[in-house]
Amino acid sequence: MLNVAVLVSGGGTNLQALLDSEARGENPNGKITLVVASKPGVYALERAAKAGVEGVVVRRKDYATSEAFDAALLETLKSHNIDLVVLAGFLSVLGPSVIEAYPRRILNVHPALIPSFCGPGMYGLRPHQAALARGCKVTGATVHFVNEAVSYTHLRAHETTL
């Protein structure tokens, strides 16, 4: 069974969907064993606690450099024997050391159908608002493997909604 860490920055609605799916037995090959928040006090940590999952905070601003932040994050993941990382509304960009430590084992959940409505500022409800403002008839979400290029060449799934 894979030990899964979910990285979050806010309310944790994607985290809750993953926890609910796990509770229904839909993920027999993995278990969420750690939630890492980018700041204290986010509701996602409360969701983790309610589900009996350990929650920790690793804040970028607590480290002098991005490399130091990445080292702290990597140490947190390794010390919890994490096999798979899911970015579920995590608003920090991971550095090369983290990505290299988890090749094709970091998944990002993006709230739009990539390549539309992605890039700076496109997180949370913003991609959906942009899609509505543009008059899109179909919207949805994308799950993709994270790579150093911040590209979307390794898409795992598109899920559309009307």
What do these predicted regions represent?
Residues 1-43:
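N-terminal Rossmann-like dinucleotide-binding module
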Residues 67-103, 115:
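Helix-adjacent hinge/juxtasegments
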Residues 119-152:
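Short, glycine-/small-residue-rich phosphate/pyrophosphate-handling segment
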Residues 30, 34-59, 63-67:
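Short, surface-exposed acidic-centric catalytic microdomains
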Residues 97-126, 132:
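Helix-loop-strand module that forms the ligand-binding subsite of alpha/beta enzymes
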Residues 153-160:
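Conserved small/polar residues in nucleotide/adenosyl-binding loops
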